[in-house]
A protein has these predicted regions:
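Signal peptide-proximal N-terminal region
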Residues: 36-53
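Short consensus segments that form the blades of beta-propeller domains
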Residues: 3, 26-28, 102-103
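Pro/Ala/Gly-rich low-complexity, hydrophilic intrinsically disordered segments
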Residues: 1-10
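Glycine- and acidic-residue-enriched helix-capping/strand-helix junction motifs
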Residues: 21-39
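Short helix-loop-beta-strand segments that form the rim/entrance of peptidase-like active sites
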Residues: 48-64
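Acidic/histidine-rich, surface-exposed loop or edge segments in extracytoplasmic proteins
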Residues: 12-23, 57-62
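Caspase-like (clan CD) cysteine peptidase catalytic core
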Residues: 9, 67-167
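Short, intrinsically disordered, charge-balanced linker/junction segments flanking boundaries
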Residues: 171-176
Length: 176
């Protein structure tokens, strides 16, 4: 765990998915919402954190593959945060797009749907593992980030289900 001796940094992952595989799931505003959120975080972030602001935007408006809202890019970004962030830093994650739930009873999880998915049918484990981010995935990736201050915002249907899994983040070891 990295402990910063200096001032805290802000790390933000902002994800918007408007354009899905095919046209059945396409939405109008998540890309715009992500751009607006990133702009707001940058404006407020520079007031509070000065030049110590790192914002990563992943959306379907991205022009190069590493800027697209894919599962791989989301995971890569959060793993980078885990390597760079210290205990005194702040991490914010924002997701706008489709969300759904899948699973039986207590194994039911929230799933954020990424760019390459074409339907909300998650019965195929390959689809879930390659084209979605589950609340379990997100909990695992965020737990690996040493920052004691983490905020997750979902603008997606069924996102209340994510709260159950993410509530375990409150159990992080917060000793200095």
């Amino acid at each position: 765990t990295i402990t910063h001796k200096g001032k805290p940094h802000l790390y933000a992952l902002v994800v918007g998915t408007s354009d899905y595989s095919g046209t059945n799931l396409d939405l109008r505003f998540p890309d715009l919402d992500a751009a607006a959120m990133a702009h707001g975080l940058q404006a407020v972030g520079t007031r509070l954190f000065e030049d110590r602001v790192y914002i990563r935007v992943l959306s379907t408006a991205g022009k190069i593959p590493q800027d697209i809202s894919t599962r791989a890019n989301i995971e890569k970004t959060l793993k980078e945060f885990a390597e760079k962030a210290g205990t005194g830093d702040v991490v914010i994650c924002y997701f706008s797009g489709h969300g759904t739930t899948y699973g039986q009873a207590e194994k039911n999880q929230f799933y954020y749907l990424t760019k390459d998915i074409g339907s909300e049918n998650l019965s195929d484990p390959e689809i879930r593992n390659n084209y979605t981010v589950s609340s379990g995935d997100l909990t695992k990736w965020l737990t690996a980030i040493p920052a004691h201050k983490e905020v997750v915002i979902f603008d997606a249907c069924h996102s209340g289900k994510a709260v159950e899994a993410l509530s375990s983040l409150g159990a992080k070891d917060l000793s200095p």
